[in-house]
């Protein structure tokens, strides 16, 4: 597709025979308006809201300064503070509308703010209307001291200016008014019968979208009925509401008499290339041109199925030789008669005069392009397009930028984008048959009709193949995208799994190492403390046991002498008082031992507490150690008491059997051997 900025003029040359009716349609470009521009443009809406907020703030400041400078009464709008808080709401709404990012929450917020801003605007209008009630009689007259001038100007700007802008924008530019020019060249028979041509054109607006479908040029006369046009060649026409209509005044056709030549209708129009995205529905209102020729013969029906327009590149006249003008066309059969077959062509910036059709040789090419060679041009002159009234035997020159017609003219041609290869198909056989007199028509019409059907079938098949190729390419792209997305999802899942696994391993290693270190630390702290406590207890008990043993031995040695003397003197009846005295001594010794053990346990507790506070580095093991120490401290006096009690019992047993020692010495020796004094 070409760029739309270039304006070109193009011409269709349609060669037909007399007694024919040509039905053609002419499209128009849709007119842009302010509403279409603002539709779907949130940035423009936000910018207008911000500008209106600034205007309202400006008016509010003017009224406030007027009150300060001239001490006049403020209107109700300014007293309510609408110029300030209303402007703030408008600015916030405009900012959010401009910075609207495609998210659901933000879209809902922008919609809510727009609703709030509309309500604020309605309140501002009501305040402005109510403020007129509190003004004096000068409010009805133009006064620079009151609010009337400012409010009126504001209403004028807000209500009248946008309507003027829309009206001006909806008026089409003069360049958009397409012009139709017809040049009728009549082919006269040998009788030189007079003919008259009359054209009627109905203009209108057409809104359409360019598609791959191809529309034929249909010519309908009146008597032989109507031939069937294939559905593939018809363009689907959808109705849409008209915005406006224009009637184009037809130019008076010029009749140029050329013996042994065809009657050509040249359609000269100026087009602007239109994009596929801007056009959505198609309405083609065909402009009818009826040529009523006064002849006795009945009109014959002719159908010219032209599947696509011819496309030529811009060729300057300097590059073209005078006797070899390349023109893109179709393969055409040479007939014995002087009249050439009907053809539809699109020329490109060619200026040629006096082009007789006798010296034209046609060549059939595989690319469906035909180059007409050896066209002898005599007396080549540069004539203007406006000089159509002067009859001459030469074709008028034409300033034709031809590349625009592929994208704009739907009158008798279909439009294809550059992505699809355009096939140029014509049926010269039908044209020759219809242009020849009845006597010269060949008999082999059936094979020619079969060839025509085959060509149309091949053309339709090529179109279907092109569309299927496009669909296949789209499917392949979709598959590639889906495979890429699947691979990316798998990669992301694998990375996430590896990361989670590594994090789990690290966490487990850290936990296990921490637990192991804590266990080792607790064991390391507990083991030396337990050993130290055991050693302290043993060290504390061992001297006590030695002291108790020594005291017991001393008591025994001391008591043996008086006991022996007493036993000798009082052998018979003095054992009981001696037992009482001995029991008193034993009780005294027990009390002394208990006091000493209590003092020692208290000293040990006072010494163990600071030592344990110094040795415990962590607060986690302090409670455990304190409990162990308390249990051990509680066990120490119990052990001491048990040892002392055992020693007392042994001592009592020894004293009890002392009397027996004197009576039977061998028996006491055996008892002493069995029960020795051990701490």
Curated annotation (Swiss-Prot):
Q: Where is this region: Disordered?
A: 218-259, 331-363, 469-491, 505-633
Could you tell me where the Polar residues compositional bias lies?
A: 519-535, 550-563, 619-632
Gene Ontology CC entries for this record: plasma membrane
- InterPro entries to which the protein is assigned, alphabetical: CD20-like, MS4A
Q: Where are the transmembrane segments?
A: 50-70, 76-96, 110-130, 141-161
Alphabetized, the UniProt keywords read:
Membrane, Receptor, Transmembrane, Transmembrane helix
Q: How does it sit in the membrane?
A: Multi-pass membrane protein
- The disulfides recorded in the entry are none
- Extract the coiled-coil ranges from the record: none
**A Pfam family matched by this chain, by name?**
CD20
Instruction: Name the residue ranges with Low complexity bias.
Output: 337-348
Residue ranges annotated as compositionally biased, kind Basic and acidic residues, are: 224-234, 469-478, 580-601
Where on the tree of life does the source sit, at the highest rank? Eukaryota
Which GO BP terms sit in this record? cell surface receptor signaling pathway
* Localization per Swiss-Prot or TrEMBL: Membrane
Primary location:
membrane
Q: What is stated as this protein's family in its record?
A: Belongs to the MS4A family.
Q: What does this protein do?
A: May be involved in signal transduction as a component of a multimeric receptor complex.
Give the PANTHER family listed for this entry.
MEMBRANE-SPANNING 4-DOMAINS SUBFAMILY A MEMBER 14, MEMBRANE-SPANNING 4-DOMAINS SUBFAMILY A MS4A -RELATED
According to UniProt, the name of this protein is Membrane-spanning 4-domains subfamily A member 14
Species of the source: Homo sapiens
């Amino acid at each position: 597709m070409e760029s739309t900025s270039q304006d070109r003029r193009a011409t269709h040359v349609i060669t037909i025979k007399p007694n024919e009716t040509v039905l053609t349609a002419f499209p128009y470009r849709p007119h842009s308006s302010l509403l279409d521009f603002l539709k779907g443009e949130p940035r423009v809406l936000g910018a207008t809201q911000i500008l209106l907020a600034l205007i309202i703030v400006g008016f509010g400041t003017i009224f406030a300064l007027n009150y300060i400078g001239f001490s006049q009464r403020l209107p109700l709008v300014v007293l309510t503070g609408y110029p300030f808080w209303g402007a703030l709401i408008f600015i916030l709404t405009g900012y959010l509308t401009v910075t609207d990012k495609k998210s659901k929450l933000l879209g809902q917020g922008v919609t809510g703010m727009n609703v709030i801003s509309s309500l604020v605007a309605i309140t501002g209008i009501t305040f402005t209307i109510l403020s007129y009630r509190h003004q004096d009689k000068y409010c009805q007259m133009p006064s620079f001291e009151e609010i009337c001038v400012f409010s009126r100007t504001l209403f004028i700007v807000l209500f009248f200016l946008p309507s003027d802008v829309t009206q001006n924008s909806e008026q089409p530019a003069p360049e958009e008014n397409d012009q139709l020019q017809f040049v009728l060249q009549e082919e006269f028979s040998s009788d030189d019968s007079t003919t008259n041509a009359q054209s009627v054109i109905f203009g209108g607006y057409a809104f359409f979208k360019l598609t791959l479908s191809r529309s034929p040029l249909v010519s309908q006369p009146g008597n032989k009925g109507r031939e069937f046009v294939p559905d593939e060649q018809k363009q689907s026409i959808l109705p849409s509401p008209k915005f406006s209509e224009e009637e184009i005044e037809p130019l008076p056709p010029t009749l140029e008499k050329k013996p042994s030549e065809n009657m050509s209708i040249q359609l000269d129009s100026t087009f602007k290339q239109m994009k596929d995205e801007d056009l959505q529905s198609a309405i083609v209102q065909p402009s009818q041109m009826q040529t009523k020729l006064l002849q006795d013969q009945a009109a014959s029906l002719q159908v010219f199925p032209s599947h696509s327009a011819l496309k030529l590149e811009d060729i300057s006249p300097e590059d073209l030789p005078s006797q070899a003008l390349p023109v893109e066309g179709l393969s055409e059969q040479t007939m014995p008669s002087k009249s050439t077959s009907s053809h539809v062509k699109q020329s490109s910036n060619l200026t040629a005069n006096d082009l007789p059709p006798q010296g034209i040789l046609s060549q059939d090419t595989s690319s469906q392009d035909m180059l007409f060679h050896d066209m002898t041009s005599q007396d080549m002159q540069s004539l203007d397009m406006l000089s159509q009234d002067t009859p001459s035997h030469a074709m008028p020159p034409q300033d034709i930028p031809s590349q625009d017609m592929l994208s704009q003219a739907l009158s008798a041609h279909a439009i294809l984008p550059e992505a699809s290869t355009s096939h140029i198909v014509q049926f010269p056989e039908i044209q020759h048959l219809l242009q020849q007199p009845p006597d010269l028509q060949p008999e082999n019409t059936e094979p020619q009709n079969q060839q025509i059907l085959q060509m149309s079938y091949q053309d339709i098949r090529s179109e279907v193949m092109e569309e299927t190729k496009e669909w296949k390419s789209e499917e392949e792209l979709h598959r590639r995208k889906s495979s890429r997305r699947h691979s990316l999802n798998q990669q992301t899942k694998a990375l996430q799994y590896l990361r989670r696994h590594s994090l789990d391993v690290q966490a487990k290693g850290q936990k296990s190492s921490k637990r192991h270190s804590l266990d080792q630390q607790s064991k390391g702290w507990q083991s030396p403390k337990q050993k130290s406590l055991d050693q302290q207890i043993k060290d504390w008990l061992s001297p006590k046991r030695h002291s108790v043993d020594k005291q017991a031995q001393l008591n025994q040695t001391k008591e043996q002498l008086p006991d022996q003397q007493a036993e000798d003197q009082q052998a018979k009846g003095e054992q009981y008082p001696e037992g009482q005295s001995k029991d008193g001594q034993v009780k005294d010794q027990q009390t002394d031992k208990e006091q000493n053990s209590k003092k020692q346990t208290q000293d040990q507790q006072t010494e163990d507490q600071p030592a344990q506070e110094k040795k415990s580095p962590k607060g986690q093991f302090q409670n455990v150690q304190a409990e162990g120490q308390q249990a051990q401290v509680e066990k120490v006096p119990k052990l001491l008491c048990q040892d002392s009690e055992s020693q007392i019992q042994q001592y009592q047993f020894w004293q009890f059997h002392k009397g027996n020692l004197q009576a039977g010495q061998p028996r006491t020796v055996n008892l002493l051997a069995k029960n020795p004094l051990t701490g």
